[in-house]
Amino acid sequence: MLLTGGTSHTFPVLEIDGRAIGDSSEIIAALEERHPERPLYPDDPEQRRRALELEDFFDEELGPHIRLLAFHELSKDPERFEAVIARTTPGPVARLGSGAVTYARTYTGLRFGVRDEGAAELARTKIIAALDRLEAELGSNEYLAGDSFSVADLTAASLFFPLVLPDEGPVPTDEPPPAGIASFRAPLEERPGYRWVAETFRKHRR
């Protein structure tokens, strides 16, 4: 909100041509327009429709719930919560110093209800449902829409990051995940969708 003038409540935030964009779908659209030589939107109309539909599904049905669960488990370990915030908070918020942690704790509490165990249990159910959908949509294919990496793959893989924690992700994974995340993901690690997320990061994260 501080970066986008109240128009967005989420990270990441991209500043382009003096304009701060805080919605991931809008960020992708802006980058697609600016750098069309590496398209994330398929040319084929049906594949494009499918990619955008899946982008919307994972944004709406996975994103809020996996964020809630990640912060729910992190909130049980204040020191680790502070360490994660220090590593991931954007510059303008990080400049608040110790206030950044207070801001993050208040923000996640109000936006996600991170201390609500009922909400966390619903989040676990939603995450598994999203993994089911991912596997159903993939079938035996490498990509979700067509035969190349698209916005659908980018969205699904990036939103599953807090669960899978591949080494190629946006934050260091040198420490084990919170105990609650570790116990939740243990029975999921051999699922095709889980392995697909790890492989997608390995192949496409630079």
Name these PLM-found stretches.
Residues 22, 46, 61, 122-125, ...:
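Generic recognition of short, well-ordered alpha-helical interface segments
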Residues 63-176:
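GST-like fold's C-terminal all-alpha helical module
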Residues 12, 36, 112, 118-119, ...:
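Residue-level detector of alpha-helix boundaries and kinks
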Residues 1-95:
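GST-like domain detector, emphasizing the conserved glutathione-binding G-site
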Residues 26, 50, 65, 80, ...:
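Exposed alpha-helical structural elements
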Residues 45, 117, 121, 187:
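Charge-dense, low-complexity intrinsically disordered segments
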Residues 159-204:
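Short His-centered aromatic/hydrophobic patch
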Residues 28, 32, 52-55, 59, ...:
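Non-transmembrane alpha-helical segments in soluble domains
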